[in-house]
């Protein structure tokens, strides 16, 4: 097979994994990124004052049920055992999340067994809501007014900048309650943290003789003609110069502060009350429990609407955005020799494991398209 010249826009997980897969098959891969570092939003770095490893763009915990993906990251990093145990400050008390038997008993001042807790939550739920349409209705139906208002209402307003009565029920897909004392935030089979950080992991993925990386480099659409194929992991609307307007995202602001000793005793503390302006405080040294640090680095995290010069984090995907997305998809689907990938390229919220799985699949589809002399699709996943 003749070696192809590949341009990849973005040096996060999507771009790095696709690039590595194609480089290993002998293709010449050029990866560019407008930032001054690799890793996208999973970038981490040592704090100069405390030497704590900081998740610069907010907490990233690796969790998956996909064994192929787990094996892949273990090839490029030593994965340390890590369980994400989130706490929440509500009405002057600290509770465990997700809501579990301990949370229920503490909140209602009871000593329920699992079956008693099930009965209690069923009794609290609003059974008159037969077909919940909104986030609020879904929560009231599932868990009732007290737990909803304590743990979900204020936090959701801060996170999304909207009333829960304006958000779709699908955001709260299933009963967010456990009737045991399990306080592991994730249900996945494989969970961990790269011992030397995500930046080092992605550096390992990019370490191949057929990969060239240029940082602080903007993508110029006209450059496409110099390459056989482009994989674009930047924002879909940006690719088209925002000609129909900007797709809606939430962005995050982080207020960093340092502390001597332990600030909060856990990695993540949610603040559920709408009266507290931030959504959570992250204490970064708790993401690396195998290390010892006297000092501590903390982030207060604030969520707001993403504006022109902000970093887009969470795609909103409400009705208005989906109509706008459709316009951009109608442009994209007429393209040739380009594939839109990743969180920004497909306007979907993706965890790291899904991003890697989709990148592996995309590379496979491209290699197969070459073998079979078929056109490469513009999207390798469903984006609607």
Swiss-Prot record:
Q: What general EC class does the enzyme of this chain belong to? A: isomerase
Instruction: Cite the InterPro entries for this sequence.
Output: UDP-GALP_mutase, UDP-GalPyranose_mutase_C
What changes when the gene is disrupted?
Abolishes lipopolysaccharide (LPS) biosynthesis.
Write out the pathway annotation from the protein's UniProt entry.
Bacterial outer membrane biogenesis; LPS O-antigen biosynthesis
Q: Which residues bind FAD?
A: 14, 33-34, 41, 60-61, 219, 343, 350-355
Q: How does it assemble?
A: Homodimer.
Identify its protein family: Belongs to the UDP-galactopyranose/dTDP-fucopyranose mutase family.
Q: What is this protein called?
A: UDP-galactopyranose mutase
Organism this protein belongs to:
Klebsiella pneumoniae
Q: Which gene encodes it?
A: rfbD
């Amino acid at each position: 097979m003749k070696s192809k010249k590949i341009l990849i826009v973005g040096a996060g997980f999507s771009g790095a994994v696709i690039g590595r897969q194609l480089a290993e098959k002998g293709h010449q891969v050029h990866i560019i990124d407008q930032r001054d570092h690799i890793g996208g939003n999973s970038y981490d770095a040592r704090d100069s004052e405390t030497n704590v490893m900081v998740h610069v763009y907010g907490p990233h915990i690796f969790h998956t049920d996909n064994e192929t993906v787990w094996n892949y990251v273990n090839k490029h990093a030593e994965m340390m055992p890590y369980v994400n145990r989130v706490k929440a400050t509500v009405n002057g008390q600290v509770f465990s999340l997700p809501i579990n038997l301990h949370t229920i008993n503490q909140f209602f001042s009871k000593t329920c067994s699992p079956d008693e807790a099930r009965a209690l939550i069923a009794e609290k739920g609003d059974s008159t809501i037969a077909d919940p349409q909104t986030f609020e209705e879904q929560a009231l139906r599932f868990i009732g007014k007290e737990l909803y208002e304590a743990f979900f209402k204020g936090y959701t307003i801060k996170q999304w900048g909207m009333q829960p009565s304006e958000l779709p029920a699908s955001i709260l897909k299933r009963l967010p309650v456990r009737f045991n004392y399990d306080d592991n935030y994730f249900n996945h089979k494989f969970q961990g943290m790269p011992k030397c950080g995500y930046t080092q992991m992605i550096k390992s993925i990019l370490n191949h003789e057929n990969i060239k990386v240029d940082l602080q480099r903007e993508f110029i659409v006209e450059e496409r003609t110099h390459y056989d194929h482009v994989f674009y992991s930047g924002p879909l609307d940006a690719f088209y110069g925002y000609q129909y307007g900007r797709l809606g995202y939430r962005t995050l602001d982080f207020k960093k502060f340092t502390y001597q000793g332990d600030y909060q005793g856990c990695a993540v503390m949610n603040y559920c009350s709408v009266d507290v302006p931030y959504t959570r405080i992250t204490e970064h040294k708790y993401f690396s429990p195998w290390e010892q640090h006297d000092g501590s680095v903390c982030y207060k995290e604030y969520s707001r609407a993403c504006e022109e010069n902000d970093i887009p984090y969470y795609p909103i995907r409400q009705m208005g955005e989906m109509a706008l997305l459709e316009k951009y998809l109608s442009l994209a689907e007429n393209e040739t020799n380009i594939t839109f990938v990743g969180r920004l390229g497909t306007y979907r919220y993706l965890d790291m494991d899904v991003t890697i799985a989709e990148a592996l699949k995309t590379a496979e589809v491209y290699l197969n398209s070459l073998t079979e002399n078929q056109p490469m699709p513009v999207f390798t996943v469903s984006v609607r």
